UniProtKB/Swiss-Prot annotation:
Assigned keywords, A-Z: Isomerase
Keyword Nucleus among UniProt keywords: no
NCBIfam families: PRK02925.1
The protein's enzyme class: isomerase
Protein's name according to its UniProt entry: Uronate isomerase
């Protein structure tokens, strides 16, 4: 019987173990998409205790706590202490067997805290609390200290076009920081004209860009100024959260002006008008990314804020989102083609939340590859509800069957937590075990030189090359 979480965790044969320990584990981390706070990195935040760094803002854990029947006051309550929330988590973890949270929890205790032989639960919580808090009080366990311990080379944060990026500039000017922290352009509030806050947001964009927006070309000018600002601060990637993938042929500027004018006047737009405006903005933005050498990321298929009562109480991104089931293939094909037809499709990474769409994306990327760019269009790693063992395996296997796994840019945390870098370890173990199993079964050559290059490329090298502006 295997022992839980040894050094060979998830590695089932000698080939897998060699690939992981010798080649994957030493590679740096290139975390090109996350939701870390740039201010916390700039300020080198020190965490008061394990409960704070572990549970603050972690909606994965919050969902598990709710499923275990824990009172909301012990999850997000403002008046509840970090220790009380931590103990609620300690009582919940033994109930998460079979959920990736059980693996992640113990991986996060192993690295960076060095707790390797103790199962986390109510009986061990007090001892672990004390051990971890002692370490969190040292400089090696500040925000940047943890990143350095985990061998992080680069992180890409997620930033709104109106953001000042002052903390990115502060980080770039600090010679003591040897980790690149690059902003990523997230313009969701610009192209989602149907949202209630769209008009108010345009007012903020006007102020940030110093451009009055009454026509579509005004919007282009405002966005161009903000794109220039992001570029000056080291941005080379964009990201778009797309719940409903719409497409309509882009109308002329007169029609776009009319659509924008109706919305600014408070009138209700038709579904066609929403699709026309959304498509126009996304296609125009895509062409700007291509001209700048940026990567375009599309995260497709979440259904957000399902629980109205809790949304009113806590707001977005608090654990009440799930997988949508809208059809995406036709609209995605037309959207990408609208940029490619003029040879202005940027490097693109596609992520789907519904695993039903894995093969859709795995085959879609082959339609739009470009000469001179290996893996120009990528099928991104298992996202959100899919960044667990089965989800990662599905994505890896389907990409390998329908594309080129060797060109894959690999894993990202997509996380708000400084302890989530162990997800790269989790991914790397799964990747090495998959390749090791194929080699053991005679499906691919047991060629250490060939396989080690592939592992190192997927773990780091491909992403570093892909996100470099040439």
């Amino acid at each position: 019987m295997a022992t839980f979480m040894t050094e060979d965790f998830l590695l089932k044969n000698d080939i897998a173990r060699t690939l992981y320990h010798k080649y994957a584990a030493p590679m740096p981390i290139y975390d090109f998409h996350c939701h870390l706070s740039p201010q916390e990195i700039a300020d080198d935040r020190r965490f008061d205790n394990l409960g704070q760094i572990w549970l603050e803002g972690d909606h994965y854990k919050w969902r598990a706590l709710r499923s275990a029947g824990v009172d909301e006051s012990l999850i997000t309550g403002k008046e509840t202490s970090d220790y009380e929330k931590y103990m609620a988590w300690a009582n919940t973890v033994p109930k998460t067997l079979g959920n990736p949270l059980y693996h992640w929890t113990h991986l996060e205790l192993r690295r960076p805290f060095g707790i390797t032989s103790t199962l986390f639960g109510p009986d061990t919580a007090e001892s672990i609390w004390t051990q971890c808090n002692e370490k969190l009080a040292t400089p090696a366990f500040s925000a940047r200290g943890i990143m350095q311990q985990m061998n992080v080379r680069m992180v890409g944060t997620t930033d709104d076009p109106i953001d000042s990026l002052e903390y990115h500039r502060q980080i770039a000017a600090d010679d003591s920081i040897n980790i690149e922290v690059a902003p990523s352009w997230r313009p969701d509030k610009v192209f989602k004209i149907e949202l209630d806050g769209f008009v108010d947001y345009l007012g903020k964009l006007e102020a940030a860009a110093d451009v009055s927006i009454t026509r579509f070309d005004d919007l282009r000018q405002a966005l161009t100024r903000r794109l220039d600002h992001f570029a000056a601060c080291g941005c080379r990637a964009s990201d778009h959260g797309i719940e409903t993938l719409r497409f309509a042929p882009v109308p002329d500027d007169a029609q776009l002006d009319a659509i924008l004018g109706k919305r600014l006047a408070g009138e209700t737009l038709s579904e066609l008008e929403i699709a026309q405006f959304t498509t126009a903005v996304l296609v125009w933005l895509g062409r700007q990314y291509a001209a700048r050498g940026w990567v375009m990321q599309l995260h497709i298929g979440a259904i957000r804020n399902n629980n109205t009562r809790m949304f009113r109480l806590l707001g977005p991104d608090t654990g009440f989102d799930s997988i949508g089931d809208n059809n995406i293939s036709w609209a995605l094909s037309r959207l990408l083609d609208s940029m490619d037809v003029t040879n202005e499709l940027p490097k693109t990474i596609l992520y789907c939340l519904n695993p039903r769409d894995n093969e859709v994306l795995a085959t879609m990327i082959g339609n739009f590859q470009g000469p001179g760019i290996a893996g120009k269009v990528q099928f991104g790693s298992g996202w959100w509800f899919n960044d667990q063992k089965d989800g990662m395996l599905r994505q890896l296997e389907q990409l390998s069957q329908m594309g080129l796994l060797s060109q894959f840019v690999g894993m990202l945390t997509d996380s708000r937590s400084f302890l989530s870098y162990t997800r790269h370890e989790y991914f790397r173990r799964i990747l090495c075990n998959l390749l090791g199993q194929w080699a053991q079964d005679g499906e691919i050559p047991d060629d250490e030189a060939m396989l080690s290059r592939m592992v190192q490329d997927i773990c780091f090298n491909n992403a570093q090359r892909y996100f470099t502006i040439k």
